[in-house]
Amino acid sequence: MSIDGGAVQAVVSPRAWTDGHEAVAMPAAVCLGLLRQAARIHRAGLKSYGLLIAEPGAAGYPFTATGVVFFDPRKNRRNDPGYRAAFHAQGDYFRQFDDAGFVADPGELLAACRAIEDSGQEIVAPFHTHRRQPANFSLIDYRLHNPAFAWHLIISLADPRRPVLQPFAVAKDPDDFGISDRDAGQGSELAYPGPEVRPLALVAHGSRRALRRLTTTLHPLDPADPRRPATPQPMPG
């Protein structure tokens, strides 16, 4: 944790931050709100996904986020017949779990984009949760990432007691987007191996109290030994 001009900040992602490397900056309160809402949706057995937004003049833009827009997970179109077939073509994992993957409802997406534009803010990145997988940027994440955005935030809730926030820089050709029911994929949930994807540090900033709440949420203490972080017990998958 460091203090910069009176503002307290800390790296809260697995990826460390070193001078000369890109990082994403977010207020600790925004990170905490994001985690809490994602956890509520996860407990309901659903997947979270949405948009991260910021004012165009914000420091570090577009590698920053000052607000979050959640889409209604009950409107996930992933299991509509056409989309379902395309996801099934990505491998066994996507045939086994019908909550693996998401497709935003077009009407909801349009309404959100209009509201964001009217507010004077801009979309800087998408985000979504991994309900069973670690905080990697998977093969299917790469294929479905909108190349208009330079980064993407993954929230792993594989162990809900120890959530993980990990942003990734993503470089894609504008025409490289989408999946098809003609694919014959396998292992699409595994990490994308190419140089087009790079993990970024996530630097949270704010009051000491907000930082403490966030770091405690991400790294809870073991009740048997308050000095030692709890050991995660990942779910299968």
Language-model region placement:
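Conserved beta-strand-loop surface patch within small alpha/beta domains used
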Residues: 1-123, 131-237
